[in-house]
Regions:
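Hydrophobic beta-strand segments of well-ordered beta-sheets in folded domains
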Residues: 2-5, 29, 78-82, 118-123, ...
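Conserved catalytic region of serine esterases and O-acyltransferases that act on ester linkages
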Residues: 184-226
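Active-site segments of SGNH/GDSL-like serine hydrolases
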Residues: 84-90, 112-150, 175-181
Length: 226
């Protein structure tokens, strides 16, 4: 059975809830999800995460205790690896430190050094919401939409440069994510209300469509193998 691994921040946990519910997942493919809330590119250390068996956050809506929680050691270097990091960096840190190039360079280095046998697919970070929603709870500093868009562009420009230099050519673009959910930008009315305070997490209907996009892209790569 072909393996697809999807790792990233809390948005991976959210889309994972729709695995098995969508119509594009064939029985010959096994998808493993590892998503960690607030996981930034800057704090990625795949070797350490593997050795310490760092646990994922699990699903936001758990059907049972520990639903979706797995150690990072379950992520093997033997299939298609989709990486969906960078949202946290763009939202919270890059406007403050203005080090998008360094962050992107470290990201690619971590991938290349730790996943030599995988087919790599880099998913561009979830596009920023027009409002910095977490500011309402004091969870994060507040940066304007334009500030975050500027840092997003810097990060993506550097990310593609270093990926190209490393021979990584498979990407899922922010424009494809927006097309999948049928909008030009992400707005507060698209967020779910499952938490007691506003969160920058999309409603189920959008996460389901995003997962469909990821699976379809992965299946295209699997077809190229056969």
């Amino acid at each position: 059975m072909k393996k697809i691994y999807l790792i990233g921040d809390c948005h991976v946990s959210r889309v994972s809830e729709h695995y098995g519910k969508n119509k594009v997942t064939p029985s010959l493919v096994d998808v493993v999800f590892w998503g960690k809330a607030a996981k930034s590119v800057w704090n990625l250390d795949f070797k350490k995460m593997y050795e310490e068996e760092e646990l994922s956050s699990g699903k936001e809506e758990q059907l049972f205790y520990g639903d979706g929680i797995i150690p990072f050691s379950d992520i093997k270097d033997d299939g298609i690896l989709l990486l969906w990091f960078g949202y946290v960096d763009v939202r919270t840190f890059l406007s403050r430190y203005d080090n998008a190039d360094e962050v992107a360079k470290r990201y690619i280095k971590e991938i290349v050094n730790n996943f030599k046998n995988s087919t790599i697919v880099i998913i561009e970070p979830l596009p920023q919401f027009t409002e910095m929603i977490l500011k309402y709870e004091g969870i994060s500093s507040h940066y304007t939409y334009q500030q975050r868009l500027n840092q997003n562009k810097k990060f993506l420009d550097s990310l593609h440069k270093y990926a190209h230099d490393a021979g990584i050519t498979n990407f899922i673009f922010q424009s494809e994510i927006l097309d999948a959910v049928g909008v030009k930008e992400l707005t507060p009315d698209m967020t779910h209300n499952k938490a007691p305070h506003p969160v920058d997490g999309l409603k189920d209907e959008y996460n389901s469509k995003i997962l469909d996009l990821f699976i379809k892209k992965s299946l295209e790569l699997l077809n190229d193998w056969s």
